[in-house]
Amino acid sequence: INELAGAWKHSRARPFVHIMQDKDIEENYHAQFMEQALHQAGFETRILRGLDELGWDAAGQLIDGEGRLVNCVWKTWAWETAFDQIREVSDREFAAVPIRTGHPQNEVRLIDVLLRPEVLVFEPLWTVIPGNKAILPILWSLFPHHRYLLDTDFTVNDELVKTGYAVKPIAGRCGSNIDLVSHHEEVLDKTSGKFAEQKNIY
């Protein structure tokens, strides 16, 4: 934790950092650990579970439930969640997705936070690329049999059928929606979750 606190001291973070997480219980630990590092580095924090307490002030600025301006966040939320929101809006409208500065029901979306120009987000957008499992088949094709890689493909290939394989959603998290399949094509174990509609790697 000392190294993490040291990194925060040398960051461009503002004095107050909102720690954003969804309501998945597994994310509580990550949020609390980061909060401890931030406190050690001298920052004030507030953990936001979900988006329910966020809203806008009269000037259209994003605020938390205590009326504090939200302008610096560290998040456990996956960028993929924001992309899903963009896709959802894009399916209905042909214009660019607007970032809200108000809403009749005060409903704040994740994209209203993460894509606001004035909000400094710790976990930059480029982390989507190494964080997405779709890069694994590409790495395997570039570096086959590398000691730090497993045979991975976008389809079940002959080699995977021989050895058995795992089925994983490309942007899944927390061990959700994973199947373990034997070389006899029997499902040995599986987990449920909210990523069943995603494309898989094998």
Q: What function would you assign to each model-found segment?
A:
Residues 1-202:
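Domain-scale recognition of functional cores that engage charged ligands
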